[in-house]
Amino acid sequence: MFPRDARLDMYDPELAKAIAAEVMRQEDHVELIASENYCSTLVMQVQGSQLTNKYAEGYSGKRYYGGCECVDIAEQLAIERAKQLFGADYANVQPHSGSQANQAVYFALLQPGDTILGMSLAHGGHLTHGANVNVSGKLFNAVQYGVNGQGLIDYEAVESLALEHRPKMVVAGFSAYSQKIDWARFRAIADQVGAYLLVDMAHVAGLVAACVYPNPLPHAHVVTSTTHKTLRGPRGGIIVAQAPQEALVKKLQSIVFPGIQGGPLMHVIAAKAVAFKEALEPAFKVYQQQVVKNAKAMAETLMLRGYKIVSGGTENHLMLVDMIGRDVSGKDAEGALGQAHITVNKNAVPDDPRSPFVTSGLRLGTPAVTTRGYQEQDCVDLAHWIADVLDAPADATVIAAVREKVAAQCRKYPVYR
């Protein structure tokens, strides 16, 4: 029997200390990593529930284990809410991550050696879109497209590559691209060569749900996403589609289970259901609108301070700061900002002369600070402090002064009140 009042700090003080330190770090540091956010206490409550004890291989009503009648309800709630959120006719909420959701789609619709056309990691794509260090670039013949001199997706080049290589699948989506994507143009390109169009909307799913970013579902054969990032749920993945053919649904269902996964994580699926319910609330749309306003304010301020933003600004939640030609690298900038309690990630930029472990860029995003309650002026102030550090990354006095300002801002906007 397990006592309900058991204390981790008494049983495992080393682990309890690490968790407490992380809680403090999240409160005392400004989080600007574009893929990170804070989920609600309700999401965390469900994720830590007794549902973690239940094995439930299969799907609702068709399990390989008994005693699944309660978790069936949780999974069905997640499915129906995901469909409502994105205007989907099909949803699979079992993928453990966005990467596994992408992997499922590849394995469902492609054969090893087939050609895929995806966005280059160096130009803002994702590892799972055909990078040669990822399984997607090892099992498939991955052809990569990128951005033009203005930092925008070159649709004519994408079309030319598609006509030349005749891919079986075109992949649209990104991890570091700050403009809107023309999903219809991508579908037209895919149709020209008889390819599937897979859209990975992991970074913008929350914006899509709130109708502040174009919805890819009317154009894509299949759409994948994470459930954290802008969607502000637990770490996990989903696959959704609008009006899919029955054969496609069967392939997707059978590849997720039993194809690449066994038992689903029912505590995470239930937490997804809570997050989807939160995303259906009117306040979520207001939040996503503010995410974009804050990102625009930050990007504009950094440009006023002389820093180049790839593509000249942002239309979503993130921006990529291009520091090619400057003495400071992305790695050094990340470290200096970290000392000021501003958390960012180094990121390659188009035509980056530095290695991926050093880089000449920074990726910044506003989902987490907006969850805290930041408004445009807060992000303007924050952008100025970032520029102060980037202007003098080795100046301890500057870093200390910024750290004090960050501390005051964090006290003003606690994550969990």
Swiss-Prot record:
Sites bearing N6-(pyridoxal phosphate)lysine, chain numbering: K229
Name under which the protein is recorded: Serine hydroxymethyltransferase
Enzyme class per UniProt: transferase
CDD domains the record matches: SHMT
Protein family: Belongs to the SHMT family.
An individual GO BP term: tetrahydrofolate interconversion
Plays an important role in substrate specificity, annotated site positions: H228
Function: Catalyzes the reversible interconversion of serine and glycine with tetrahydrofolate (THF) serving as the one-carbon carrier. This reaction serves as the major source of one-carbon groups required for the biosynthesis of purines, thymidylate, methionine, and other important biomolecules. Also exhibits THF-independent aldolase activity toward beta-hydroxyamino acids, producing glycine and aldehydes, via a retro-aldol mechanism.
Keyword Cytoplasm among UniProt keywords: yes
GO CC list: cytosol
Upper classification of the organism: Bacteria, Pseudomonadati, Pseudomonadota, Gammaproteobacteria, Lysobacterales
Binding sites annotated in the UniProt record for (6S)-5,6,7,8-tetrahydrofolate: L121, G125, H126, L127, S355, P356, F357
Molecular function (Gene Ontology), one example: pyridoxal phosphate binding
EC annotation from Swiss-Prot or TrEMBL: 2.1.2.1
Quaternary organization: Homodimer.
One Pfam family matching this protein: SHMT
Catalytic activity: (6R)-5,10-methylene-5,6,7,8-tetrahydrofolate + glycine + H2O = (6S)-5,6,7,8-tetrahydrofolate + L-serine
Pathway, per record: One-carbon metabolism; tetrahydrofolate interconversion; Amino-acid biosynthesis; glycine biosynthesis; glycine from L-serine: step 1/1
Cofactor: pyridoxal 5'-phosphate
